[in-house]
Structures are given as structure tokens and as C-alpha cells.
Amino acid sequence: MKTDPNKEKALNAVLGQIEKQFGKGSIMKLGEDRSMDVETISTGSLSLDVALGAGGLPMGRIVEIYGPESSGKTTLTLEVIAAAQKQGKTCAFIDAEHALDPVYAQKLGVDIDNLLCSQPDTGEQALEICDALTRSGAVDVIIVDSVAALTPKAEIEGEIGDSHMGLAARMMSQAMRKLAGNLKQSNTLLIFINQIRMKIGVMFGNPETTTGGNALKFYASVRLDIRRTGAIKDRDEVIGNETRVKVVKNKIAAPFKQAEFQILYGQGINSTGELVDLGVVHKLIEKSGAWYAYKGSKIGQGRANAGKYLIENPEISDEIETALRSMLLSKGEKVAAGATDTAGDNVDMETGEVF
């Protein structure tokens, strides 16, 4: 297709002027001089990484994780921090709920000596700290726990019973506008943990909604709905939760997939159990009766013992995980045993529409 040389000349002139004024890379052709692959950080769950399509949560984007109480929201974000720190990245935790347990974080593999932590007094202070860390370009992952705890200054200084209609929503809307561009420039991953509330008077559809207004829903590249679906028992003792995560929104890959995994109390996501299950499904691990074998060598009787063997032999665990990732995250194949194509009962939070 021929182009008008005068138009081409004018375009090159204006592109040069824009780059001179706003910096190199401020405008470019979509397929030119840039990698189309999004850099990601693992969530700690292989099936969730596969359900997300890109192998984890995307850098330079906003992510929202919401769900009921004790569903595993903070655990999931701590797993992300642990994975990021293993890659040498700097992480920060904005603890607006004042409830972060450093002992539990350490058990999940978080290097608490190198984790930046802030417990702000107001919502504005929390978001300003977020913005300052982002603009510095020195922090790679920021967690805000939680949006519901980001209390506007006017509400804190006022009295209980005072009406502050829409204050938190306006605060979040302004913060999103300010943060979105800075996050892209600094390639910082910002994760907001959010809580669920019930809409009053909703007779049809889903009455659930998230706090902080609609701005976060629009600006988030990924939204994850995390729910506890059952208990894991060792005889009569409950030792963990069966957990399901639905990818409600995804701007980097196909949305509406879901992943199921286990969260063990005091240990976090049962990643070795996932490896055993996925390894069997994709024929990397042989199962004969109750026995599991890898490359002809028995690794344990029963899933728990096979998982224990992988913990004690990290090189074999890494080998299986690498093989599974290359198998499941290449050639467009994005579905694993714990990551399904459709989220069956996935419901839009606003309309109540079932996907």
C-alpha cells in the first residue's frame, strides 16, 4: 500500500517533536521496537498462573483480588511477594488494616527483612505513599490491604454517625487516574485487596459488590474472585482450605477461567500437591494404584507422600514445573487440571449476569 510522501514526512516530523518534548517511547507504532510479551510474576499456584494465560500477574498493571473473609486474599498476595523476592525484586506492603502477621509471612517464604511495610493513618496517606513508591521506579510490587480500610481523612477526623457519601469512591477515582500512567512507566505491579459488601434491595441477580466505587474495576487489568470451597482434613483436624479463584476480568489473556488449589494453614498454597496432580494429568508423573513415579523411580505412596518427596528434592520439583509451564503456556494451550476454560457459575459483580 502506497503512502503519500508528504503525509509520511509530516508524520515523522510530529513524532520527532513529540519524542523531543515528552521523551523517547512516548509514542510508537504498536508492533515496532517493543516486546509484545507481558512480564509476569507467579502467584505461587501453577494452575492459577495457567488460568491467567500469561503465567502470572502482569507487571506495570493494577490487579484487584476480592472475596469473603478468610478466603485466602492476603495469603495469595504474600505468595506473590515471595515469588517476586526470589527474582530479586523489591516489594512493599501497605497494611491499611494493621493486621499483617510477619511470622505467617515468613512461613510463606517472604523475606521480611527486605519487605517494605507501611501502616498509614488515612486512605489519602496510603495512596500518596503508593504513588511516591511508584514514581521512584525502585519498587516492583506494591500490595494494598485493603481498599475497605482506606478511610478518608475527613471521616477519621469527623464523628461516628456523620455522613460521608461517596468520599472513598472519589478518593479512589482520583488515585487511579494518577497511578495508572506512573505504574506503566515504572513497570510496577500494584495489587489491591478488596472486601465484599451486599447491595440493599437487590431482589434479582447477584447482590454482592466490592468497596471503593467503580474506578478500580475499570482501571484493573486483572480482577480475581477468590472463594473457599471446602475444608481439608487430616483425620478430624482441619488443616487447610480448598480454594477456587475465578478470573473475572483479564486484559492480558482470555478471561473467565478458574483455578482450584489448596491453601494449608501455616504453609500457604500447596504447590507440590498441584505439581503431582498436573504431572499425572499431563503424563509427566506415572500413577499406579496409590504409588507415584517419575522417570521410572517411585516418589511416594499417596499424593501427600509424593508431594513431600518433591519438597525434599527441589531440583526434581523445578524440573517438573518447568516442563509443565512450557507445555501449558505455549502454543495457545492454557488449560490445566486445576484451570478450566469456563468459570461455570462465574457472575458479573455489577449485573448479576452468569457467564
UniProtKB/Swiss-Prot annotation:
InterPro entries: AAA+_ATPase, DNA_recomb/repair_RecA, DNA_recomb/repair_RecA_CS, P-loop_NTPase, RecA-like_C, RecA-like_N, RecA_ATP-bd, RecA_C_sf. One of its GO terms (molecular function) is single-stranded DNA binding. The keyword Repressor does not apply. Gene3D superfamilies: P-loop containing nucleotide triphosphate hydrolases (3.40.50.300). Keywords: ATP-binding, Cytoplasm, DNA damage, DNA recombination, DNA repair, DNA-binding, Nucleotide-binding, SOS response. It is found in: Cytoplasm. One of its GO terms (biological process) is DNA repair. GO terms for cellular component: cytosol. ATP binds at residues 67-74. It comes from the Bacteria. It holds the Pfam family RecA. PANTHER family: MITOCHONDRIAL DNA REPAIR PROTEIN RECA HOMOLOG-RELATED, RECA. Can catalyze the hydrolysis of ATP in the presence of single-stranded DNA, the ATP-dependent uptake of single-stranded DNA by duplex DNA, and the ATP-dependent hybridization of homologous single-stranded DNAs. It interacts with LexA causing its activation and leading to its autocatalytic cleavage. Belongs to the RecA family. This is Protein RecA. It comes from Shewanella piezotolerans (strain WP3 / JCM 13877). The gene is recA.
